[in-house]
Amino acid sequence: MDRAQKREFVDQLAAVFAETSMVVVSRNDGLTVADVTALRVKMREAGAQYKVAKNRLAHLALEGTRFDGLKPMLKGPTALAWSQDPVAVAKVAVEFAKTNEKFVLVGGALGTQMLDASGVKALAELPSLDQLRAKLLGLIQAPATKVAGVLQAPAGQLARVFAAYARADEADAA
């Protein structure tokens, strides 16, 4: 990489850090190309990204961002993963760490809050934003569904009573 490419890479990474809500730092020492490719595919499916970056370039990109506290974690062969959905990137990273012992979580940051590896694991246990939205929608719709059922019940009962009277009148007439 020449200087212009490095500057462009740092600028791209800084732009990512300005827009994202969660960054996870991991050790990627000993991972095969197939492992990294599989991890990238899983990250993309979850709406996250995974990138191996030189620590010095990552340091430069982190300067002045809310993730500035990640700098001490950037030692040795590290990689960064990020996403708008904080739970998605944490879940993929934790699940991959369970299946691949060479992938080690170092920590991360959620906004300005720095997390160690156990903090990232705890975050991975939370429901995702989509799951929370579905639960909230279900909670909002449940009362309306119950009210509609209650309002329809008397009308249905009244219709059954009229039908019973009609059958009784037909039976008496016959």
Swiss-Prot record:
Transmembrane region(s): none
A single GO BP: translation
InterPro entries in the cross-refs: Ribosomal_uL10, Ribosomal_uL10-like_sf, Ribosomal_uL10_bac, Ribosomal_uL10_bac_type, Ribosomal_uL10_CS_bac
GO CC terms in record: large ribosomal subunit
Top-level division of the source organism's lineage: Bacteria
Keyword entries, A-Z: Ribonucleoprotein, Ribosomal protein, RNA-binding, rRNA-binding
Alphabetized Pfam families for the sequence: Ribosomal_L10 (PF00466)
Molecular-function annotations in GO: large ribosomal subunit rRNA binding; structural constituent of ribosome
Function: Forms part of the ribosomal stalk, playing a central role in the interaction of the ribosome with GTP-bound translation factors.
Subunit structure: Part of the ribosomal stalk of the 50S ribosomal subunit. The N-terminus interacts with L11 and the large rRNA to form the base of the stalk. The C-terminus forms an elongated spine to which L12 dimers bind in a sequential fashion forming a multimeric L10(L12)X complex.
Family named by the database record: Belongs to the universal ribosomal protein uL10 family.
Protein name: Large ribosomal subunit protein uL10
Annotated organism of origin: Acidiphilium cryptum (strain JF-5)
